[in-house]
Amino acid sequence: MAQGFKPAKAKKAATSPKSGSKAKSGPKRGPRVIAPKKKAAVQAAKTKQKQTASITARIEQEMVSRASKGGPLTIMKKAADGDADDKKKNQNKK
């Protein structure tokens, strides 16, 4: 054949968008790991994780104690006081 002749390329079979592989949505599973060569970042992440865990545990225990007492289950004091005042006003009206 002549120079520069290029045979026709084989066409790919037409695929519908549904048959293609689906990209996973959402974050990846598992904990995020910081490279061990960054000691300061690793240490900061550890302390942040400990603080978060302790704060969460304290809030959960506080909510359990409030639930057992039968009081309002709000974390913010002003909102709890406002709810208690509203309940007292409603009881006085009846």
Curated annotation (Swiss-Prot):
Residues 1-24, 41-57 have a biased composition (Low complexity). Residues 1-94 are annotated as: Disordered. Pfam families: DUF2462. InterPro entries: UPF0390. It comes from the Eukaryota. Residues 78-94 have a biased composition (Basic and acidic residues). Residues 25-40 have a biased composition (Basic residues). PANTHER family: LEYDIG CELL TUMOR 10 KDA PROTEIN HOMOLOG (PTHR16967:SF1). Belongs to the UPF0390 family. This is UPF0390 protein UM03986.
